[in-house]
Regions:
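A structural motif
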Residues: 26-31, 94, 144, 179, ...
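Glycine/Thr-rich beta-alpha phosphate-binding loop at enzyme active sites
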Residues: 42-51, 130, 136-177, 215-225
Length: 232
């Protein structure tokens, strides 16, 4: 499992290609998260919700994500129709799907449906908002491979302030379920990364701290020097 996972929030197809090119050229990167925001469950809408016809055209054309031979793509589905949208990203070569429990009416049914259609080659994870009760994910732990705690109160956009409530959420969850990999997404920086790792986080999902750095590659290298005792 990757300790540092760059996250990209695309505003357009062109923006997605440019942001992926920035990270996929780095030898140390073997996993990238793509944020997908529908403008309803979270806002503002990102690509492809900002241009739905483009997504359909890419699926029909058989487009694939770059460097699938060495990079695993994880799709963070901040949308109410995650089941439908997931199929398009899987056709592009994504192998990890993160569903937000608050966006799904019937989580067990969704997970079972996705698993029955796509098998075990994909990794399914559940994300939970900072204000939500972890019981929402705990009843589904047998069907997923990882949990994502949101480190910000307002999801769907990068650059939001880190919410320290996530420290206690992670601590308690990891103590109760040490076998489940935990990742934190939102507000991750060098100021809080070491503490998150010490509490049991396996992967740091990092967006704005890399995107807004003058040198993203150098910023990534600093994060990669961190050490985690939990499965990395």
């Amino acid at each position: 499992m990757s300790l540092v996972v760059p996250a990209v929030l695309p505003s357009s197809r062109k923006d997605l290609k440019e942001k992926l090119a920035l990270f996929t050229r780095l030898p140390s990167v073997n996993r990238v998260q793509i944020d997908v925001v529908d403008g309803e469950f979270a806002s503002p809408a990102s690509w492809p919700y900002s241009a739905p016809a483009e997504l359909e055209a890419l699926v029909e054309r058989g487009d694939m994500l770059p460097q699938l031979d060495r990079i695993a793509y994880e799709i963070d589905l901040m949308c109410l129709d995650a089941d439908r949208v997931a199929s398009a990203w899987l056709s592009f070569g994504a192998t990890r799907l993160t569903f937000h429990v608050e966006s799904v009416t019937d989580v067990p049914q969704l997970l079972a449906s996705v698993r029955s259609r796509y098998g075990n080659f994909i990794s399914l994870g559940l994300a939970i908002n900072i204000a939500s009760d972890p019981v929402l994910i705990e009843q589904n732990l047998g069907e997923i491979r990882y949990v994502q705690f949101m480190g910000i109160a307002r999801i769907g956009r990068q650059g939001q302030p880190f919410d320290e409530r996530v420290f206690e959420k992670v601590r308690i969850f990891h103590e109760q379920h040490p076998e489940i990999p935990v990742q934190v997404d939102g507000g991750v920086s060098l100021k809080n990364a070491s503490r998150l790792l010490a509490l049991g986080v396996s992967s740091l999902i990092i967006g704005s701290a890399l995107a807004r750095a003058g040198n993203s590659a150098a910023a990534l290298a600093v994060f990669e020097e961190l050490q985690s005792p939990y499965g990395v």
